[in-house]
Amino acid sequence: MDHLALPIRSPPTSERNQQSRNFFTSYALPSAAEAINGPVREPIRDFAPIADRLIVGVDFGTTFSGVAAVYTSNPDDVEIIKTWPGGNGITSDKVPTEISYELPPDAPAGTKPTVKWGFQFRPEESRLRCIKLFLDRSQKLPFYVSPLETAAQLRKFNKTVVDAVSDYLTQVYNHTMDTLTRRYGESFMASTKVDFVLTCPAVWSDHAKNTTLQAAERAGMGAKSSIQMISEPEAAAVYTLKAIQPNHLNVGDNFIVCDGGGGTVDLIAYKIISLKPLKVEESAVGTGGLCGSAFLNYRFEEHVKTRLGKTRFEEMKTKKGKTWQMGLRYFEEFVKRNFNEDEHHEINIPFPGLADDEEVGLDSGFLVMTAAQVKDIFEPVVKEVCDLVQGQVDGLRAKGGIVSGIILVGGFGQSDYLYRRLKSFFTSAAPPPYSERPTHASANSIGDHAAIEVMQPVYAWTAVVRGAVLRGLEGNMVISRKARMHYGTSYATVFDEEKHSVSERYWSPLWERWMVSDRMQWHIAKGEAISPLTPIAFHYTRNFRPGQSLVVTDDLIACEADEPPVAYTRDLVHVCKLTTDLNAVPRSLFTRLTTTRGVEFDNLDFTLEMIVDSAGLGFELKVDGVRYGRVDADFQ
């Protein structure tokens, strides 16, 4: 179950340096400090402006997933899929991100298990939950998700996490295509191209992004290089800034997108560069936390268990499952979204079939909860969200930025209580006069307690998936992003007794010098801005003896610390292995060199150019400015 393991660290010596010790083959010149942000992809291309195209956005969420579609000839008519298998005719903007496998008791060996997903489960049935989080081995899991139980369920059916995600996305894909066929007809669908835009968390690792794309490709959504990917807060920003018009945001202002989901809350800050057309740049590295609305459900469950007593509560869940589900659904659909302590002094949770108990607070099939009791469920989770947002605000203000808005989206983003808490938390200062827009200088003079407008769009729960289809329609709104980590490669260099230990040196028979390996060249700095329009160049010099393979490998390495080391250490993260085939380069571009001992070898100077988009990266091989092919990357 390698998908449940911790992040794989690099071996003590990278493959590139193992080759370097045999014959010195590389030297990396310094390059501009830029950034990296996703899986291997072709250079970014916006969708071609052609007619007869359907764009489908898929918001693959931790607890719920959603799908939206739009026809390019009618761009204002974004449709949300609301009917799902097992939904019993009840419409829902999203479907649970849950899946299970089943085999008949007498099934022969090799029988393919049947799949249940989404709304197809009875309350007591076992299923895989939060499988998305297992794609990123650096992500923490909520307390209610057991890695051991998940691993056991997968192992029983010889499945991996990627298999489960792919199987779930396959069900989403098949239902989406069936729904679109009913909507538009078979002949229309047969002649119309369908492009998919997939969302991912802001804090997703490069490995997780690449694996998510692989799962989507296996599900039938297209080739990895053709599936567009956009971060969830970015998609929410695309939709919200267009939906909330007019708003008070001006060029130069920063706003924070707070995407509150079921399991996680993700935040990204953006600075407005232009309003028409709308262009923004990422102004702070994305952050996130395990403080989604599912934690409210579990706090509610603990509250009910405490009130009823463990024995009576467990008996209700096992023998009166529908009673518990009705109470939980009421909490989910009404209390979580609409609770307001100023208006709701008493909440009555339906638990039909439970006997009256004045001491417990059970009356006529209802459990009576005071506003203070409900607030006690909300407050610890909401405080975590406020602290996350405050961290983004503090970081922006420390750099002299104006923070003018917080955009609240996602399922948890619908919560009236969360909206009011954020509003009171960030609008304690009196707003500036309406008639006079403050300059940056005067706004900064207000201090750290300047009011920040909190905005909540009408369709907060589907803001991400609506933004995904808008991205497919209109292309990239974000012109630059921030690096989550330092990224670089290791290299060998000439031994310098003032810098290096004698124990580190080795003799290079080709360069005929003492060398040291495992030096780090950090091409990309943590927190640096990058643009998909500006490739990042890695320069190399490599030597080849006669008959030596021209297929070379390099390790792409990352560092999460604020200050990266000058030499390779075991705690650096191995991102991927880059494989470059130099056979396409004309032999005339190689330089023939000879050592003093008469040993001939070929030398080649070449460049790897990295192109970054919203959730991916691609590499090209260039020699003297001429492109000679794509570089493959294997994420570890």
Tell where the protein language model's regions lie, with residue ranges.
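Glycine-rich phosphate-binding loop plus the immediately following alpha-helix
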Residues: 94-104, 126, 272-318, 362-386, ...
